[in-house]
Amino acid sequence: YFEETPDCIRLGMRQAGEQIQINARSIIDSSGGKSGVAQWLGIESQPLAHTPASFSVYGHFENVNPWKGCSTDAMDSAPPYPPNKAAVHHLIHGGWVWSLEFDHGPVSAGAVLTDAAHASIKTASAEIIWQHILEQHPRLKECFHKAESIYPMRKIERLGYRMERMHGDRWIMLPSAAGFVDPLLSTGFPLTLQGIQRLGAALRPETLRGSGPIQAFPTIAEKSQLELSICDHLIGTLFATMDPFRHFAATTMLYFAAVSYTETAWRLGKKHLAPGFLFSENPEQLNTLKTALKHIQTIQKENTSDDDKRASIQNIITSTIEPFNVIGLDPSATTPWFPADMSPLFKNANKLKSTPEEIQSMLHQFGLTF
């Protein structure tokens, strides 16, 4: 049972066949998609507004051929480092596949597949779905044809969701329990870290000892829900632009420009320039980002040539990110990578309300030399 009183929460549960009771001043639910509080209170989850319904299969593998040894004729030039040393995301029809090599050898790999594009295999086992994907994509099969699964592959029947409610008077869910979008850009990490940071700033011993609702919970929950919504909008737009790839690549720059600006501003001690994740706490910047995402989706649906669509999308992204593009991103670039170059930070110091000297000092402070 779950009983909320004015000054505490009482939990009743069974552990190892024994009935136990726990009294807590407050509860922070960090249990992920199987939210314990949601199960206790019967809180329902809802589908996402923008990201298509999807499912996932995944596992850990040994004897995976590195991507550098696979066919790379689609690339214009040699990559700057072995691709398999990064978290590699392969876009496929109706989804994407990840491949993440650990330092000691094994590879974490899996696929996110939309219900609409893969309805015919959704009810199959994880292993059958995985083999189907490999058969459909020879370059992936080339990497995994000798691979051995370390443990039975697993399957998530429904990936994206958001809870109808994420807080009560004395309990709150971390963003990881309140909702999940898609691991495409690993946005779950900053969403949850933001939630932890806000809770850490708001909760004090005297706050927990007092009676009645914890006043900070509604505001924290509202901010987390807003960030979940903009992530959903972003990922949904990326799914809509996966084909052709250059539309997708250009659209990702909305994300990379925003988060690199935020990271730099925060390291400069100027958090007010980029409050929240993806400008979630700045209504003007947030609205600009959302408007760009809407326009991109509209263009993607137009009955025009891919070249015309790409030019329109690139123009929107270029103008949208101009005020916060401090790392030299170019939506019209034909190569799929940008160097780890600090010089754009100096050129764009004014966008960060800073001087080149302040940029230099910040880089030295964090162990980066230029």
Annotate each language-model stretch with its function.
Residues Y1-R139, I196:
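Predominantly flavin-linked oxidoreductase catalytic cores and closely associated redox partners
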Residues A201-F370:
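C-terminal helical "tail/cap" subdomain of flavin- and related membrane-associated enzymes
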Residues D73-A78, F144-H145, I156-R158, T219, ...:
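A general structural signal for short secondary-structure boundary/capping elements
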Residues G42-I43, F144-H145, G367:
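Glycine-centered secondary-structure boundary/capping sites
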